[in-house]
UniProtKB/Swiss-Prot annotation:
Taxonomic lineage of the native organism: Eukaryota, Fungi, Dikarya, Ascomycota, Pezizomycotina
Annotated protein name in UniProt: Carboxypeptidase S1 homolog A
Membrane topology, from the record: Lipid-anchor; GPI-anchor
MF terms (GO), sorted A to Z: serine-type carboxypeptidase activity
Gene name of this polypeptide: SCPA
Domain of life: Eukaryota
Glycosylation sites: 77, 132, 161, 168, 184, 202, 260, 299, 347, 410, 474, 492, 505, 594
Annotated region described as Disordered, given as residue ranges: 608-628
Any GO CC annotation of this UniProt entry: side of membrane
Compartments where located: Cell membrane
SUPFAM superfamilies: alpha/beta-Hydrolases
InterPro entries in UniProt: AB_hydrolase_fold, Peptidase_S10, Ser_caboxypep_ser_AS
Length: 652
């Protein structure tokens, strides 16, 4: 999901923002020039910023691709400098598999996943120090976090002076030729990307083309990763429900072209040996998931009622009415099939039709929920949600951290340029060549494992819609999967973390008491699910070898809806300067703007905020805790805050 587009800069004193926020000079990086193309290079630096386990290495860096019209089959007259953060596995990295991690957006940084969900460390509330995450996904797997497409996070096209408004949550290109303006609580300065919407991928398919070229360079020429295990997996989240299927199927198609000698260019013939696609709370296809946006706020396992049955029914009628959401989605897809068959998004007529479908579906589906003032990413939380806390933004603003990373740009966890580019062509309304559910089917037929994992408190990409996707696939195992029942996910001797339907290589899991970013809410459960899938074990128990038992299927109930949940207490409010629009009250925003707010470690201490009201419920829905002995992480976990202006088209 989308976060505030804040640029992280230094704020070292309480109640002021006087320090200049530009990154320090880049020093001490290793430069590796490609043996295939003199204009391609990798720059990187080893550090222990987050992973502090003795003997476990980690590296930050960029893969630099020059402007080149031939790279992607589309006009690419801009440099691509793609950021990565690589963590070796804590156990046996030489023989461990590797997983790529991608957040969604479109335009969200994968640092969200690293620091808020499954990376080696949590950021403490001082925004300066870290705590080891014992449930890190790099315990047994090499992890590669990538900021993509171009201009996302630490990735950039050209270094550009910028200002950031904490009040309006916007980045603007700045001219500092007459001097750098003084910083204050509401206006910060830094170095970022050009902010040009055309200087990045403009749709999911073009992003797939771009990331494949990154992978060709990184896996062949990054000198610090020479494993015995060449398996590669992709795990992703949210808008990654589109990224993951599209990217993985594109990788698989390119593998086939390399094998049959359709691709013969030197430096582009590395087989990416795909093993697993994992999607967490994925927004995959509106045709399957649209109705869940009407149903979930009214009918969920927490007894929360964001609106009435009459409102729910009206939304569904709007979706199905002539010239409604479904009609416009169909028109977009037909227009794209005829007018943009190669998915370049360079046909203005098709772009306009699909952008209208994208916008209208947002309107039908999202506006009724906005009135409830509930969290998009956690329906049990208020809209101004301090959980997960966004302390990683301040952490990544430290000059010492930027220096250790070797980054020439400040951190921005959301790219306005990418968001504008994708939404301008109506990317969320479009499919790719097979459609994203078709991609999943293709991967399953190709022997790739696919796991759909959904937290049951998320609204924006909720589990009801995810379940519909899982049941709507058309592949050789469709009927066997549908006949499989739901089994308990046994996390430890005292805790059941969710329910899973699995047949062979395909699974759908509902994770209890988790919002959008499942690993941040339920780190132990998420790690068990992740490792069981990665190492070919059944998700329910982790005891059966699925590689040796391809006909394995879970047994149990047909539905999970009978398992109800208790509403958790509302989190204590925390107004965080670098997520002000998503965590602060109007009074606090006014204090930030006029400079009267008292700030300590980016947290607004005065004026203070009062705790929000609990969500509305209905007495007709029984509630019961799904199990005892919850393995939820209590602290310190770094998570996200959302924007009150979020719409369906923005995802993490």
């Amino acid at each position: 999901m989308r976060l505030a587009a804040s640029i992280a800069v230094a704020l070292p004193v309480i109640g002021a923002a006087s320090a200049q926020g530009f990154p320090p000079p880049v020093m001490g990086v290793t430069v590796v020039k490609s043996k295939y193309d003199e204009n391609v290079k990798i720059t990187y630096k080893e550090n222990d910023i987050c992973e502090t386990t003795e003997g476990v290495r980690s590296f930050t860096g960029h893969v630099h691709l020059p402007p080149d019209n031939d790279y992607f089959g589309v006009y690419q007259n801009y440099s691509i400098n793609t950021f990565f953060w690589f963590f070796e596995a804590r156990e046996d990295p030489k023989n461990a598999p590797l997983s790529i991690w991608l957040n969604g957006g479109p335009g969200s940084s994968s640092m969200i996943g690293l620091f808020q969900e499954n990376g080696p460390c949590w950021i403490n509330d001082d925004s300066k120090s870290t705590t080891n995450n014992s449930f890190s996904w790099n315990n047994r797997v090499n992890m590669l976090y990538i900021d993509q497409p171009n201009q996302v996070g630490f990735s950039y096209d050209e270094l550009t002076n910028i200002t950031y408004s904490t009040i309006n949550d916007t980045i603007s290109v700045a001219d500092f030729s007459s001097g750098v303006p003084a910083q204050n609580l509401s206006t910060l300065v830094g170095t970022g990307s050009s902010q040009k919407p055309w200087a990045t991928a403009n749709n999911t398919v073009n992003a797939a083309r771009s990331i494949w070229h990154f992978a060709q360079v990184w896996f062949q020429e990054f000198p610090e990763h020479k494993p015995n295990n060449n398996k590669i997996s992709i795990w992703t989240e949210s808008y990654g429900g589109r990224y993951g299927p599209s990217f993985a199927s594109y990788f698989q198609e390119q593998n086939e072209k390399i094998k049959n000698h359709t691709i013969t260019k030197e430096g582009e013939m590395h087989i990416l040996n795909l093993d697993t696609l994992g999607v967490i709370n994925g927004c995959i296809d509106l045709m399957f998931q649209a109705e869940s946006y009407a149903e979930f706020p009214y009918n969920n396992t927490y007894g929360i009622t964001a609106y009435t049955k009459e409102k729910r029914d009206a939304i569904i009628r709007d979706i199905h009415r002539p010239d409604g959401c479904f009609d416009k989605l169909a028109k977009c897809r037909e227009a794209a099939k005829e007018g943009d068959p190669h998915f370049y998004s360079n046909n203005a007529t098709v772009n306009a039709i699909c952008a209208e479908a994208n916008s209208d579906c947002d309107k039908y589906l999202m506006e009724p929920f906005q009135e409830a003032n509930l969290g998009y990413y956690d329906i049990a939380h208020p809209l101004q949600d301090p959980f997960p806390p966004p302390f990683f933004k301040g952490f990544l603003s430290q000059s010492s951290v930027l220096s250790d990373m070797g980054s020439p740009v400040n951190f921005s966890h959301y790219s306005q340029a990418v968001g504008k580019s994708f939404h301008g062509v109506g990317d969320y309304a479009r499919p790719d060549v097979r459609g994203f559910t078709g991609d999943i089917a293709y991967l399953l037929e190709s022997g790739v494992k696919v796991a759909l994992v959904y937290g049951d408190r998320d609204y924006i990409c909720n589990w009801l819609g995810g379940e519909q996707v899982s049941l709507g696939l058309n592949y050789t195992g469709t009927e066997a999967f549908r006949k499989a029942g739901y089994a308990d996910v046994k996390v430890n001797s005292s805790y059941v973390g969710g329910l899973v339907r699995q047949h062979g290589n395909f699974s759908f899991t509902r994770v209890f008491e988790a919002g959008h970013e499942v690993p941040g809410y339920q780190p132990e459960t998420s790690l068990k699910i992740f490792e069981r899938i990665m190492f070919n074990k059944d998700i329910a128990t982790g005891e059966l070898d699925i590689a040796q038992k391809q006909d394995y299927g879970t047994t149990g109930t047909e539905s999970t809806f009978q398992v109800k949940n208790e509403i958790p207490p509302s989190p204590e409010p925390t107004c965080y300067l670098l997520s002000a629009d998503g965590t602060c009250t109007p009074e606090q925003l006014n204090a930030i703007e006029n400079g009267t707010a008292v700030v300590e470690n980016y947290i607004i201490k005065s004026p203070a905020a009062s705790k929000g009201n609990p969500p509305p419920t209905t007495t007709s829905s029984p509630t019961a805790s799904p199990t005892a002995g919850s393995a939820m992480l209590k602290a310190p976990v770094a998570m996200l805050a959302i924007s009150a202006l979020t719409v369906l088209a923005f995802y993490l």
